[in-house]
Design a protein with these regions (language model features):
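Gly/Lys-enriched N-terminal cap/neck module of very large, oligomeric protein machines
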Residues: 2-200
Length: 200
């Protein structure tokens, strides 16, 4: 699996639609200060489900929408799409290519798309479990994140290693199963109480 392209339109400093295409192999984005490199990284984090405007270096989520300049009007939406080559089927989906997109309007309305079909943030998160690609994955390291990791709490570092080792999805499934089991045990207690009352 590798990143094939990033399409950005109306996101932060990208007023016009731009498509970055990446050949297979190691890829980097270089450029002078202020040219938008960090905004590209923010765009990838955003399309993967980042919900914190602070993590995207903004005050609120509408700050990701191009706000205009002296010569350009503000735009009414931001759109980002990433396309991944999935020919090795690292992602649990039966497509050779997977495109995840996110659109946000100034009204606050937003949507996620998976291969052009509307989906939930939960679907995007589940697709990327244990790949290191999720919004909190180790594959996207923003400004200041290394210091945060090194000075972070042991539990936070453990979460990062769990993600890298591929055991996060099992922990989440276990947690959901334990919760369901507890709910069923409570239901069983209620049924037994009702049966006891009926037998009296």
């Amino acid at each position: 699996m590798y990143l094939k392209s990033i399409e950005i339109n109306g996101f932060k400093s990208f007023a016009n639609k731009i498509v970055f295409e990446f050949p297979q192999g190691i890829t980097g984005i270089v450029g002078p200060n202020g040219s938008g490199k960090s905004n590209v990284a923010d765009a990838v984090r955003w399309v993967l489900g980042e919900q914190s405007a602070k993590q995207l270096r903004g005050g609120n989520m509408q700050d990701v929408i191009f706000s205009g300049t002296e010569t350009r009007k503000p735009l009414g939406f931001a759109y980002v799409a990433i396309t991944l080559d999935n020919s090795d089927h690292n992602l649990p989906i039966d497509y050779e290519e997977v495109t995840i997109a996110r659109r946000l309007y100034r009204s606050g309305e937003s949507e996620y798309l998976m291969n052009g079909v509307s989906c939930r943030l939960k679907d995007v998160n589940e697709l990327f479990y244990d790949t290191g690609i999720g919004k909190e994955g180790y594959s996207i390291i923003g400004q200041g994140q290394i210091d945060k990791i090194l000075s972070g709490k042991p539990e936070e570092r453990r979460e990062l290693f769990d993600e890298a080792a591929g055991i996060v999805k099992f922990k989440r499934r276990k947690s959901m199963s334990v919760k369901k089991l507890e709910e069923e045990q409570q239901n069983l207690i209620r049924v037994n109480d009702i049966l006891s009352e009926l037998e009296k």
